[in-house]
Design a protein with these regions (language model features):
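Detector for a conserved hydrophobic position within an alpha-helical segment of the HATPase_c
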Residues: 149-158
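Conserved catalytic submotifs in the C-terminal HATPase_c
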Residues: 49-60, 95-97
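Short C-terminal beta-strand
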Residues: 120, 171-181
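Glycine-rich ATP-binding loops of the HATPase_c
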Residues: 159-166, 174
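Short beta-to-alpha transition helix within the HATPase_c
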Residues: 25-41, 75-78, 93-106, 111-113
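Short conserved segments within the C-terminal catalytic ATPase subdomain
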Residues: 43-53, 86-89
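A short, conserved loop immediately preceding a beta-strand within the C-terminal catalytic
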Residues: 20, 57-63, 67
Length: 192
């Protein structure tokens, strides 16, 4: 009897997740990035400036969990700031891209429309940086930072992919690919 109840529970547990997946609201990507950057007020104290380049139009959204995307952006931004020990420029960019089999960057994503959110820094890279930023011992806040593997896994959970590239003496660029959607625009009828 316990096996039947367990199987029955698992089936009921799966059904709501499928319906929630379909009803996931579209997240306007540019708005999300702008609100996220507004919350990064602590960067000025560290000598880090922020540059935004929002190429996506205002109707482009992503079909992923908003909180998960914000967590990914926070993890990638903190990682970038850790590379800029003496200050620098943190850049966030949104672009709508079409991935196909011949895509420039290697991802396991199916062909289709995606939003690429790029987070890059101008700091130098040190070989010990990956280990140093998982926990900052000297930090007054003792922030625990997610590893690059954890960020990649979170991107997969969001239905996307994370591709990072190091550039000698000029920082790192992380490209987060998320499934793109278009928000429906209701026409406004005005009388003249």
């Amino acid at each position: 009897v316990s096996v039947l109840l367990r199987d029955d529970f698992e089936q009921r547990d799966l059904a709501p997740s499928v319906s929630l997946e379909r009803r996931r609201p579209a997240v306007p990507v540019n708005e999300l990035v702008e609100h996220f950057v507004a919350a990064l007020d602590f960067l000025d104290e560290n000598g880090v400036a922020v540059h935004l380049c929002l190429v996506c139009d205002r109707w482009t959204s992503v079909s992923a969990d908003r909180t998960l995307i914000e967590g990914l952006l926070l993890g990638l931004s903190l990682r970038a700031c850790d590379h800029m020990h003496q200050g620098g420029l943190l850049s966030l960019e949104t672009t709508r891209v079409r991935l196909d089999e011949n895509a420039f960057e290697e991802t396991d994503l199916p062909p289709g429309e995606y939003v690429r959110v790029s987070v890059s820094d101008t700091g130098g890279w040190s070989e010990g940086a990956e280990n140093a930023w998982t926990t900052r011992v000297g930090s007054p806040r003792r922030l625990e930072r997610p590893s690059l593997a954890a960020l990649r896994h979170a991107a997969e959970i969001a239905g996307g992919a994370l591709v990072c590239a190091r550039h000698a003496c000029c920082g790192e660029r992380a490209n987060l690919y998320l499934p793109a959607t278009r928000r429906h625009v209701r026409p406004v009828i005005t009388s003249t």
